[in-house]
Structures are given as C-alpha cells and as structure tokens.
Amino acid sequence: MKSGRIHILLLSLLLCISCRYEQQSYPPLMERAVQLMETHPDSALACLDSLSISTTEWPEELHIYYLLLTVKAKDKLYIPVTSDTLINRIISFYEDKQDDPHLMEAYYYKGSTYRDMKDAPRAVDAFLRAAEIGKRCSNDTLNGRIYGQLASLFAFQRLYHESMEATQQA
C-alpha cells in the first residue's frame, strides 16, 4: 500500500515537473525555417510562405512568432518594408508577454523597418530600445548587430563620435 502511494506521488511529481518545463513545439516547416534563417533566408522564407494559409488558426503566440520569422527573413533578403504596422503588432504582443528575447529581436527589426523607410531618428530610437533590452538578454550576436546598425546610422547622420562609441559596443 505504501509503495503504491509512493509511486502515485512520484508520478504526480513527474507530471507537474514536465508540465512546468514544457517546451514550445513548432510545426516542422517553422523549425526548418529557423534552422535555415542565417544561411539560406530565401529557403526559410519559402518554408514560412508555405505555412501562411494555416497560421490564422494557430494560437496567437505561435502566429506572432511566425510573423516575426517572416519579418526576419525578409530583412535578411533585403526586401524593403514600407509600413511599421506589422512590427508594431509583434512588439505589442511581446511587451504584453514580457518576453525580452523576442522583444529585443522585434525592436531590432523595428529599427530595420525605419532604416528601410529612411527614417533614421526613429530607427535609432528602436535600435537603442533593442540595445536596452539586450542588457537583460544574452544574445551577443544580436547585440553586435544592433550596435553595428547604430554605428552606421550615426555615421550617416555625421554623428561620428556616437558612431565610434556604437562601433566599440559592437
């Protein structure tokens, strides 16, 4: 009788632990897009495009992550963005969730959006916000990209001292 209770207690404990540390599961094509993003963004975008029909039926968190990946792939392919509506929606979601790693990345792409729109002051503000969030995250690669973008934008505006400081941070 005691061993039965112990087994039930251990099983209950195991179930609680596994539920607490449940990892997000993504559709296989989305996982493939993540794997391809850095080296083959065109293939990553093709994977994401093939998912676009079904994304509206997904949970909001998964749908927003899909949108972030799509923005990321288009940025890597130098496809210019002409509106900040989508990236603002993504940022709003991650701010509500207090998801700093994704929020940092979203602000980076907001900066890229404004850079593409030739709005340097708003691009700088977005990149600085990403850098601020980056102090709480451990994504050295993205932090380097953020400061690299800031250095370029400062140099473009002939703010050479600020450009040098951003270069040193990168």
Question: Model features per residue range: what roles?
Answer:
Residues 2-11, 16-170:
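A "functional boundary" signal
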